[in-house]
UniProtKB/Swiss-Prot annotation:
Residue ranges occupied by any KH type-2 domain in the UniProt entry: 39-107
Gene3D superfamilies named among the record's database cross-references: 3.30.300.20, Ribosomal protein S3, C-terminal domain (3.30.1140.32)
Compositional bias of kind Basic and acidic residues: 219-238
InterPro entries tied to this protein: KH_dom (IPR004087), KH_dom-like_a/b (IPR015946), KH_dom_type_2 (IPR004044), KH_sf_prok-type (IPR009019), Ribosomal_S3_C_sf (IPR036419), Ribosomal_uS3_bac-typ (IPR005704), Ribosomal_uS3_C (IPR001351), Ribosomal_uS3_CS (IPR018280)
Gene Ontology MF: a single term: mRNA binding
Organism, scientific name: Paracidovorax citrulli (strain AAC00-1) (Acidovorax citrulli)
Gene name of the record: rpsC
Name of this protein: Small ribosomal subunit protein uS3
Keyword rRNA-binding among record annotations: yes
Record's function text: Binds the lower part of the 30S subunit head. Binds mRNA in the 70S ribosome, positioning it for translation.
Gene Ontology CC terms, in alphabetical order: cytosolic small ribosomal subunit
SMART domains: KH
Family: Belongs to the universal ribosomal protein uS3 family.
């Protein structure tokens, strides 16, 4: 199950949040969703060289707020903010409402799944060996704090006639664990031999809730230990008998008595008289009852 399903959709409302956050009734929902898809396609094509990781779209009260997560915010903003102003006007004309655009910088693009996939596809389009590009990306991700990474490429690798799939993994990638923070990204490389698809899974650790906070384990309180008394052999030991317990039963209380009786020792009390049982044995008879003499 966890190996096949989309990692982000599998964790929605558990440890992941939606990329489009707004509410609409049944009449307007389809149209607004189509607008979101067109806006994402437009931004993907326009900001192709800006290393865009993800796009968040919000629609509060007849407005729109779009947050762009990019590893190169300077490319999105442009000189003196000219590009960002033109981008706001274009998005406002497409959505029909005032649009506010926020730019968030991605601090570590080496452990972002989408940016890793885009970087590998750019190298494949420049005729770089796919194994070298994949292993280099894995080494950079593990060096900068990723706990696990898996990269899969499929298509006519190295220009061979028969398409195949190859994947490499380093560390651990628990796809079925809901609390695991799995970043997933895809990309496509358009080469002269055909299209090569890239899939990247990055495991960044465990999270609590949808705030992407690191999981903090609360230490268990140490058990209270009672002071230990001296042991029988003189070494310092522990008094294993609990406080308030009665005297222990003597060893061998249920053992068979030495006199051969079938009652446990001490069952009749100290004043009881011990009765010894004697087994009666018949005397052997003579050969002719004494008449043979």
């Amino acid at each position: 199950m966890g190996q096949k399903i989309h990692p982000t959709g599998f964790r929605l409302a558990v440890s992941r949040n939606w990329a489009s956050r707004w509410y609409a009734n049944n009449r307007d929902f389809a149209g607004m969703l189509a607008e979101d898809i067109k806006v994402r396609e437009y931004l993907k094509a326009k900001l192709k060289n800006a290393a865009v990781s993800r796009i968040l779209i919000e629609r509060p009260a007849k407005n729109a707020r779009i947050t762009i997560y990019s590893a190169r915010p300077g490319v999105v903003i442009g000189k003196k903010g000219e590009d960002i102003e033109n981008l706001k006007k274009e998005l406002a004309s497409r959505l029909g409402v005032p649009v506010a655009v926020n730019i968030e910088e991605v601090r570590k693009p080496e452990i972002d799944a989408k940016l890793i996939a885009d970087s590998i596809t750019q190298q494949l389009e420049k005729r770089i060996m796919f194994r070298r590009a994949m292993k280099r990306a894995m080494q950079n991700a593990m060096r900068l704090g990723a706990q696990g990474i898996k990269i899969m490429s499929s298509g006519r690798l190295n220009g061979i006639e028969i398409a195949r799939t190859e994947w490499y993994r380093e560390g651990r990638v628990p796809l079925h664990t809901l609390r695991a923070d799995i970043d997933y990204g895809t990309s496509e490389a358009f080469t002269t031999y055909g299209v090569i698809g890239l899939k990247v899974w990055v495991y960044k650790g465990d999270t609590l809730g949808r705030n992407d906070l690191p999981a903090v384990e609360t230490p268990r309180p140490e058990e209270e230990r009672r002071p230990r008394g001296p042991r029988r052999d003189g070494r310092p030991g522990g008094d294993r008998a609990g406080a308030g317990r009665g005297p222990r039963r003597p060893m061998g209380g249920n053992a068979a008595p030495a006199d051969g009786s079938d009652k446990p020792a001490g069952a009749g009390g100290t004043d009881a008289t011990a009765v010894k049982r004697v087994r009666k044995v018949d005397a052997p008879a003579t050969a002719a009852d004494g008449k043979g003499e």
